[in-house]
Amino acid sequence: MRIVIASLQYHPDAPSGSARLAYDEAVYLAGLGHEVWLVARDGSGRQPEYEEKDGLRLLRYPPVVSRGADPSRFSLHQDQTRRVLETHLRETPDCLHGHALLQFAGALSLYGGTVRTCYSIHSPAQLELLAGAVGAGWARKLPLYPRAAALHVLERRCLKRSASITAFSLYTRDLVRKLHGAHVAERVQVISGWANMAQFAMPIDREAGRSRLGWPTGVPVLFTVRRLVPRMGLERLLRALHGVQAAGRRFHLVVAGDGPQKPALQRLAGDLGLLSSVQFAGSVDEDALSRMYAAASAFVLPTAALECFGLIAVEAMATGSPVLATPTGAIPEVVGGIEPQWLARDNSPDAIRDLLIRFLDGSLPGHRPEDVRAYAERRFSRTHRVADLAAAVLGAQAPVA
């Protein structure tokens, strides 16, 4: 079969949770002998428009230039997706699978009605847009509402035209029910996201791993990796740690990732007297990320809003690390299955503080690292889950090339 997968970006270019799942699916299908085309934006503007790589035929379109609040940028992404497909893919595909709304809508306008169409909803588009303004004032929020409404209409249209709809958590399906109605939600098949267990090894000696990373030894090291934007809850984590420090507990926090909130977070860490206990590591590659998960005493996931799966929690558990998290979105589905007490009572700084103090005091239930990894492998192994997604996309009667 000839399959087109529409993604926000090509994961090796710009790693993210949704791009990872789209990439893994594409590589899996190509490994079965299918002809797989992956179309995505090129955020850097430096990649070739057409390239064959990883067994895939990659189509990348250049950055879309428009003002942030300009609603025309939505149609520009769709137009560019359609253009690169028309330019390079001369034969009609058999199947179209979307992992990103605008790119899927662009491809759907080209092939809809003639091919099998499937959509995986990683996060409802209007909520994703509005979540970017968590904690912001009304001056920033108000211009987003017309854009969010436009995305909502487009998403509903794409869902209606999809023969198969999947989501990566029960939480996401519940959001679909609230936003688009029960008649749409009942069509959504929940297939959990996954991690590549082979990429994440159980550490032999966490202290030695910290030393190799230049992290302090002899003190509990908390680790998180996030895009540094308000909805990720890092401001709340810093305020929680201020309370942990005031309570006399020792710790060191490493924050990997980058984003527009970084300067404000660094200033806040200074204002709270945390500079000696908090390290901003910046962007890290996947090899370094695996070593960081494995070296940490615990992984912290302080999400403030809209966590529709939580891939990084699964990756951390694949190294045997406990995950201390807020009960936001789908996180309880991922973390609660191994230990409900690893979840804070809510996503407030006080609740996060209390959870961290309990961990540092050794009063939370403990699990052997081997058991934590076994849980992650049983529930979220790429080997099984990507095959489930591919089956849903291709359909029960779809021929294998």
Show which residues each predicted segment covers.
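Short His-centered aromatic/hydrophobic patch
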Residues: 98-103, 121
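Acceptor-binding helix/loop patch of EC 2.4 sugar-transfer enzymes
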Residues: 67-68, 115-156, 175, 198
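Acidic donor-binding loop of glycosyltransferase active sites
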Residues: 163, 294-308, 321
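Short hydrophobic beta-strand element within catalytic cores of glycosyltransferases
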Residues: 313, 322-325
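Conserved acidic donor-binding segment of nucleotide-sugar-dependent glycosyltransferases
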Residues: 337-350, 357-364
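Carbohydrate-associated surface elements
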Residues: 171, 194
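Short alpha-helical donor nucleotide-sugar binding micro-motif in glycosyltransferases
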Residues: 283-284, 291-296
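Conserved donor-binding/catalytic core segment of Leloir-type glycosyltransferases
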Residues: 166, 216-232, 238-241
